From Swiss-Prot:
Name this polypeptide is given: Putative NAD(P)H nitroreductase SAB2397c
A GO CC term attached to the entry: cytosol
Biological-process GO terms, alphabetical: 2,4,6-trinitrotoluene catabolic process
Cofactor(s) required for function per UniProt: FMN
Annotated family: Belongs to the nitroreductase family.
Pfam annotation, one family: Nitroreductase
EC number: 1.-.-.-
GO molecular function, one term: oxidoreductase activity, acting on other nitrogenous compounds as donors, with NAD or NADP as acceptor
Keywords for this protein: Flavoprotein, FMN, NAD, NADP, Oxidoreductase
Signal peptide segment: none
């Protein structure tokens, strides 16, 4: 195994869902910016980046969220950095956001955009993404988990712990964030939370996973 392969495997064995962080240890600005950049630079379906990363460092807000986030209470108290990942709503070919991405970010020439829109519509129809608003939002939310995974892997490579969380009252937390002007519910929904910091103690037992042959199947020669 090469040094790089070993480094990657070591990071995955190091990573675990840290329930309680050492509140005295803070992630450096440089390291945390690298974690955020790994999220921002993550791949997404059609390259549309249907996400927003909101870093919650205000302790009063963390305390308010804690009362409605049963799966994140200890992390909200102790994490060095706490991130909410929003998923964008209404990502359709002719929505203002997609038009902005095509014209201003990807710099498509005007005459090529109708063909791109047609391919976009066909893709969403084939995958039943455009069937209803919930399917459309779920598709965006899936993309946020790509960024989430990359952020946690980057953290592990830097020797930083993390914990992804879905254990919260979605409606109540959404209301709190919306009332504070943090979440525009017309444009976004809260997809997932993730905390970063340094573990208070090592996990009590080794990582457990199913066997390789139980979850991986090769069709054709194994090379």
């Amino acid at each position: 195994m090469s040094n790089m392969n070993q480094t990657i495997m070591d990071a995955f064995h190091f990573r675990h869902a840290t329930k309680q962080f050492d509140p005295q240890k803070k992630v450096s600005k440089e390291d945390f910016e690298t974690i955020l950049e790994s999220g921002r630079l993550s791949p997404s379906s059609l390259g549309l980046e249907p996400w927003k990363f909101v870093v919650i460092q205000d302790q009063a807000l963390r305390d308010e969220l804690k009362a409605h986030s049963w799966g994140a209470a200890k992390q909200l108290d102790t994490a060095s950095h706490f991130v909410l990942i929003f998923a964008r709503k209404n990502v359709t070919s002719r929505s203002p956001y997609v038009q902005h991405m095509l014209r201003d970010i990807k710099k498509y020439e005007a005459q090529t955009i109708p063909a791109v829109e047609q391919k976009f519509d066909a893709f969403q129809a084939d995958f039943h993404i455009s069937d209803n608003d919930q399917a459309l939002y779920d598709w965006s939310s899936k993309q946020t988990y790509i960024a989430l995974g990359n952020m946690m892997t980057t953290a592990a490579l830097l020797g930083i712990d993390s914990c992804p969380m879905e254990g919260f009252s979605l409606d109540t937390v959404t209301d709190i964030l919306a009332n504070k002007g943090i979440l525009d519910t017309e444009q976004f929904g809260l997809s997932v939370m993730v905390a970063f910091g340094y573990r208070q103690q090592d996990p009590p037992k080794n990582k457990t996973r199913q066997a390789y042959e139980d979850v991986i199947e090769w069709v054709g020669p194994k090379e």
